[in-house]
């Protein structure tokens, strides 16, 4: 790899100038890709931190919800709880869009709240327990966080893929493309110097022959 050169390059001055320009662009591209890689990694870990916090919050809310639901079942009876559950009007609405993180398009999912109060859920006060209201509220809030988690985890997957792709491009430039360009530049410079020496030697021979004839 250390001495590998680009294929199909002729040792001419034009090729040398083109390769020097290409080397500058490759080095600049390498620097920009490293910056992108580092920014993506930083963003990746910042978002990753949010995942654990959201998961912990969901677990707490679900624990409260199931505890309150159990209390409601004891207070109201299983059948009454089931009737109340069946009367609830489902109305989860999602707004899905996207945003760009360092050129990576990631999802943005917004949920419009299912229910904001007891009355909007569809079951009445009569024959229901306050524990059921608390359980419903905690379940609804858990759903919102679970939707957010879906957005976050999808974003993490997409960023991880882009980080790996960017790393491969950085490594290719750093360990393959740029070294080959530099090796080819060195080869052409050396070959041009040899050609100049050969040309100079030939000119000396020609001059000597002319001088001898005179």
UniProtKB/Swiss-Prot annotation:
Subcellular location per UniProt equals: Cell membrane
Q: Which PANTHER family match?
A: V-TYPE ATP SYNTHASE SUBUNIT D
Q: Which Gene3D superfamilies match?
A: 1.10.287.3240
List the NCBIfam families. Answer: PRK00373.1-4, V_ATPase_subD
* A Pfam family recorded for this sequence: ATP-synt_D
- How far does the signal peptide extend, from start to end residue? none
What is the annotated role of this protein in its UniProt record? Answer: Component of the A-type ATP synthase that produces ATP from ADP in the presence of a proton gradient across the membrane.
The record's subunit annotation is:
Has multiple subunits with at least A(3), B(3), C, D, E, F, H, I and proteolipid K(x).
HAMAP family attached here?
Answer: ATP_synth_D_arch
What biological-process GO terms show up in the record? proton motive force-driven plasma membrane ATP synthesis
Tell me its family: Belongs to the V-ATPase D subunit family.
Q: How does it sit in the membrane?
A: Peripheral membrane protein
Question: What is the recorded name of this protein?
Answer: A-type ATP synthase subunit D
User: What top-level branch of life does the organism fall under?
Assistant: Archaea
Q: Which gene encodes it?
A: atpD
Q: Which GO terms describe its cellular component?
A: plasma membrane
Q: Which organism is it from?
A: Methanosphaera stadtmanae (strain ATCC 43021 / DSM 3091 / JCM 11832 / MCB-3)
Q: Which InterPro entries match?
A: V_ATPase_D (IPR002699)
Query: Can you name one GO molecular function term for this protein?
Result: proton-transporting ATP synthase activity, rotational mechanism
* Upper taxonomic lineage: Archaea, Methanobacteriati, Methanobacteriota, Methanomada group, Methanobacteria
Which key words are in the record? ATP synthesis, Cell membrane, Hydrogen ion transport, Ion transport, Membrane, Transport
């Amino acid at each position: 790899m250390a001495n590998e050169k680009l294929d199909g390059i002729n040792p001419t001055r034009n090729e040398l100038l083109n390769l020097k320009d290409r080397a500058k662009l490759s080095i600049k591209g390498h620097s920009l890709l490293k910056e992108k890689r580092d920014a993506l990694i930083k963003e990746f870990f910042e978002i990753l931190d949010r995942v654990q916090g959201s998961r912990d919050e969901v677990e707490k809310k679900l624990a409260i919800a199931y505890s309150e639901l159990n209390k409601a079942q004891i207070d109201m009876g299983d059948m009454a709880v089931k009737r109340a559950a069946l009367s609830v009007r489902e109305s989860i609405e999602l707004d899905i869009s996207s945003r760009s993180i360092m050129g990576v398009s990631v999802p943005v999912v917004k949920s419009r709240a299912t229910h904001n109060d007891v009355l909007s859920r569809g079951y009445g006060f009569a024959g229901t327990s306050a524990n059921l209201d608390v359980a419903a509220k905690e379940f609804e809030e858990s759903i919102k966080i679970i939707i957010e988690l879906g957005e976050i985890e999808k974003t993490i997957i997409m960023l991880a893929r882009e980080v790996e792709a960017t790393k491969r491009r950085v490594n290719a430039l750093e360990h393959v493309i740029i070294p080959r360009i530099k090796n080819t530049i060195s080869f052409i410079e050396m070959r041009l110097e040899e050609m100049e020496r050969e040309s100079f030697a030939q000119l000396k021979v020609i001059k000597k022959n002319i001088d001898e004839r005179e």
